[in-house]
Amino acid sequence: MKIYLDAGHNPTNPNAGAEGNGYREQDLVYEIARRTAVILRQNGLDVRLSRPTPETQLGTSNASSWAARVNDANSWGADYFISLHTNASNITSASGSEAFVYTEASRAYPLAQNILTQLNAATGLPNRGVSVRTNLYVLRRTRMPATLVELGFISNPADADLMANQPQLFARGVANGVLAYLGEL
């Protein structure tokens, strides 16, 4: 089973991530993706990271960065694509994890549900549910079931500190969600 883990965004522009509470999205999600890959590999899954190092820069624009991730996953023949991100809001009390899929009819929908259930169990953050988003490039251009997971809110001090200081909780939640979905947990 091949799992493509996309650590969302680039270390610098173009396509750098959100910033909040002294943290950068691209740094937080890289560390969580790296740790998730270790757990999944320990459970016998083949995992590829979109950014194998924190300095890896994909593309020269937002569009080419998204395309690089999708093309890599498609050409590798991934069975599932999971893009990890942090959320942001002007409402700093907004908290929790949520996920997006292209359609509820996809196998990505129950995968995303399992990931959110396990993230909630591991981190205690609210499960904000799975929503359909047809406008996200990484969901509509992948040839395999794909989900974009917003791990927590970088704009919320408690969420941001938890992601920065306890990345293993998020990695365990994502990995357990994948394993539960595959019937291996």
Language-model features: locations:
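Catalytic-core regions of hydrolytic enzymes
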Residues: 2-4, 9-97, 101-110
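Ser/Thr-centric signal marking residues that sit
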Residues: 50, 123, 142
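Active-site-adjacent mobile loop/cap segments within catalytic or ligand-binding domains
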Residues: 4-6, 12-17, 71, 76, ...
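Active-site-adjacent substrate-binding region
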Residues: 106-132
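Conserved beta-strand segments of alpha/beta enzyme cores
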Residues: 46-48, 126-129, 145
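Sec-exported extracytoplasmic/periplasmic mature domains
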Residues: 34-45, 74-78, 116-124, 175, ...
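Short, charged, low-complexity patches
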Residues: 29, 108, 112, 163-171
